[in-house]
Regions:
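C-terminal accessory/binding modules appended to enzymatic or scaffolding proteins
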Residues: 129-145
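Short acidic (Asp/Glu) and glycine-rich catalytic loops that position anionic groups and cofactors
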Residues: 29-37, 69-79, 122-126, 152
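Charged substrate- and nucleic-acid-binding regions of tRNA-handling and nucleotidyl-transfer enzymes
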Residues: 143-171
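Hydrophobic alpha-helical scaffolding
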Residues: 1-4, 39-47, 75-89, 93, ...
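Internal glycine-rich alpha/beta core junctions
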Residues: 1-67
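Conserved small/polar residues in nucleotide/adenosyl-binding loops
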Residues: 172-179
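Long, amphipathic alpha-helical stalk/connector segments used for oligomerization, subunit docking
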Residues: 59-122
Length: 180
């Protein structure tokens, strides 16, 4: 159960990071709002359900330590600590089972992609030049990548600006259709 709790804790931390924002985080996904908002930042959606799972994970990991210490307390063929071991195991199983159900119904089922942010990340990524390399050549790719880093302009914008590809040709190399 400890291993499951550690993995679930990591997954929930990833959800929290992917949903961070609204302006200074990754903001790639939107979590369902479970509260009116953040007490210190109006309009922000706190990741309360992933945080609940984090807390459950910490409790399960603590219960695992209790089981380990209880096992260590055995003397010869007798372990008087079995009741607390059983209680910790049953509690952990109940916490995980209820937590998974809560996470699925109140969080996972309601997650949406923040398509605008994800699209912007892809189109503004310097890594896009790697996909263009076979089309525009290494020299042009290097030139565009360096200029994009120096100026903050997008790769597609610079390819058009330098007349390396036409807008129509560039659309065929894009991960998704673009209007601009």
């Amino acid at each position: 159960m400890r291993r499951v709790a550690v993995k679930m804790n990591k997954i929930c931390n990833d959800l929290r990071l992917l949903a961070s924002g609204p302006r200074c985080g990754l903001g790639e996904i939107n979590l369902p709002a479970m509260q009116p908002g953040s007490s210190i930042m109006p309009g922000k959606v706190n990741p309360v359900i992933p945080e609940v799972m984090n807390q459950i994970s910490y409790k399960v990991i603590g219960n695992d330590l209790c089981v380990a210490m209880s096992g260590e307390a055995a003397q010869m063929e007798l372990n008087a600590m079995e009741p607390v071991m059983a209680q910790c195991c049953f509690e952990s199983a109940d916490l995980l089972m209820n937590g998974f159900d809560t996470l699925r119904t109140l969080c996972i089922d309601g997650i949406t992609a923040n398509e605008e942010v994800c699209r912007r990340y892809v189109h503004d990524s310097i890594g896009v030049v790697t996909a263009l390399n076979p089309v525009i050549g290494y020299k042009n790719s290097t030139k565009i990548a360096k200029e994009a880093l120096a100026t903050g302009k997008g790769v597609y914008e610079l390819v058009l600006e330098h007349n390396i590809l036409s807008k129509d040709c560039l659309l065929y190399t894009s991960p998704s259709p673009r209007d601009s």
